[in-house]
């Protein structure tokens, strides 16, 4: 239907103008205006005043007020009377009978719809408050991890672990409600970002106008009165009254402190372009091996410190911080905090070749369903860490759910072991996981504290040369090379930024049968999607061209053996996707 044929062409024209303007500016209001435009265009009812539009989807008080101002301006310019506001119209007088008494009861006053304000310290409340810490004009938004970190102190429930181990739901599920009410919009794939819509900002302002807001601000500032699920650790050692053996050895580091430690650099073409350097040597006795645990590793909202307290009781006191990758790992912590800095490095920790990804069975099923499982393994591969351990915790779940996803879980575990070469450890409960981490810590102490560590200086590292350099050193000199924790975190944070190379690999891996190894071999022959498409176009038309397309990948990779080898049927399948065969 054309805009001119709409029941409200003038209102529709103005909303369309604002929608086009929002698109030009790449504004966050695009979603709101598009929803309002579509609902108004589809509505067959004619409205006199913009206030009446609030009954349509996408029209909030702010948009209706803007339309009202536009209508006033339009009426003044064209000498037209301004339609009366629906609320200002007087009710018709009640007719009386001969005795002067009303023949009917007065009409009931319409009940005004209450403006939405989420419940205090609920998931929706915390998410709105967290997003309102952004500047109202910003278009960047927050990632899920960034938003959870900001929102958690304002919520009683956990954003990472269900309050009941038998349930799937966390406080993050409130995001669905906010998206449905169009208070929040999301954008970006695969890394989604969230921001408040205009209506969302109105809700945030209403929250901050309530009597409870000042008390809530004071509560989150005072760590003794607030009980967030993820503690907001302050710099320095903090001892807990509940368990004197537990102390936070180091504060959580912000992403911005590590993000630019390692430069991006240029692409490394061959071994000759790799840097030469003198390694930093850490002799035995100059460091101790310590476990690092992610602060988000909690059992439930009532036992947020259970894991670190139990580890401390068993002699494996963890360093608590927000980790860029994995849920636990081990570092060599220098006895002299200035040892590394005196040799041109940063920090006082060196990352060892062990990292742990812990997953409860319900989280594993969820990550398989939404693709996070493969995304996490992809990032772990790019970390350069040789020994990756997947701990899978069994929990009480609905047998129907377990049976439904049993095959997917078995396939994921087998793939992790066989294709990725990672070790999978299955435990029955968190206590078993804690005992396993304790034993691993003791074993790694015995293994590493009696040997020297060769550390690659951060100044020679770039995000482009890190993996080729590590591979070259391990193959030609020694299998054991290490980097500092700040450098590792910087590289891990950069791995979230998807490059064209990463996108190409992921595109290839969507084809059934193309593993990560096979995708890498294709990329060695054709660096970009453009090169790959051009190679198929060069095969020419007709039957002969079709045959060449189907055999293109097979013929170019015929030297490969084992898991990297391409079969003719797989080559044909790739041609069907990329070569329009």
UniProtKB/Swiss-Prot annotation:
Segments for region (Disordered): 76-113
Which keywords does this Swiss-Prot/TrEMBL entry list?
A: DNA damage, DNA recombination, DNA repair, Endonuclease, Hydrolase, Magnesium, Meiosis, Metal-binding, Nuclease, Nucleus
An MF annotation (GO) of this entry: 3'-flap endonuclease activity
Positions of transmembrane segments: none
Q: Name one GO biological process term.
A: double-strand break repair via break-induced replication
Q: What is its EC number?
A: 3.1.22.-
Quote the subcellular location field of this record: Nucleus
Q: How does it assemble?
A: Interacts with EME1.
User: What protein name does the entry list?
Assistant: Crossover junction endonuclease MUS81
Source organism of the structure: Gibberella zeae (strain ATCC MYA-4620 / CBS 123657 / FGSC 9075 / NRRL 31084 / PH-1) (Wheat head blight fungus)
Highest classification ranks of the organism: Eukaryota, Fungi, Dikarya, Ascomycota, Pezizomycotina
